[in-house]
Amino acid sequence: MKQLKLNYQIEDVNSLVNNIKDSNIIKKLIENLNITDDEIITHYDLLSSYQLSNEKCQNCRSMKDCKQSTFGMKYCIKRDDQNILTDSFTICNYYKDYYTRKKNIVYTTFNEEDLLDDSQKNFFYDNVNFLGNEFIGKVLSLTKNEKVNGAFVQLNNSKLRLRLMQSLSYKLLLNHQVSIIKFSDFLKTVKSEFKISDGTSSLQEVINSEILIIDGIGNESITSWSRDEILLSILDNRIQMEKTTFICSEYSLEQLKKLYKLSYND
């Protein structure tokens, strides 16, 4: 990139150099690139722009805090092939993680931005004990790249249950491809797809996901179709393919067995 030129008269060289060196943001840059006092004079505008831009990043803790005009981009200075200082832009670490997670969402019935919100991280660790030791153990095994079939957890608090499943997806999305669905909403989507096509698009995405998180089973309008053609189809196929499935419901396994035991006329 073209070198920026000093656009005002230098009256006090020492003052100019010290002004730049006083900045904690610039100090680290000077140290990393071995920037000389002469280079500070020559590239004063460049360094000032760097300082102003990176001050916006000082208190940033997530993508929600980003104040850059170009979302997720960080202003940088480096040396080119001729060892001359030049500016460029790079993706910040927060955006790298954000982009990775976004790319790894296979299918969801939820707002993607809710799943990508960095507040999910702290929520998961603050409330993880609600999931129980067995469920937590399966999640930890996944983070160690161990084979996990899945786990079930019963949580009566619907808001807590939903938030925990979303925060679980946030944790897993950094290294895994994940689908997360509220089952009743997913059924509505599949039904609408059947009206315009064979209805298998969303169903296959969910079945083939590396990890699937299902929230709220038992809360849908249960029919033989929703049970046999959708829910059991998803679970049976995923078991055969040895895919990981996490299920969360307000009902216990015994209660779910009774709910899904339909009359023979269905």
Language-model region placement:
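Long, basic/Gly/Ser/Thr-rich N-terminal segments
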Residues: 1-91
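Charged, amphipathic alpha-helical linker segments immediately N-terminal to NTP-binding catalytic cores
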Residues: 78-135
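Glycine-rich, often proline-containing surface loops adjacent to acidic residues and nearby aromatics
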Residues: 115-122, 145-153
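Short glycine-rich substrate-engagement loop in P-loop NTPases that contacts/grips substrate
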Residues: 126-137, 147-162, 169-208, 220-225, ...
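N-terminal flanking helix/linker immediately upstream of nucleotide/cofactor-binding cores
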Residues: 138-142
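Loop/turn-to-beta-strand initiation segments
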Residues: 176-177, 208-211, 241-247
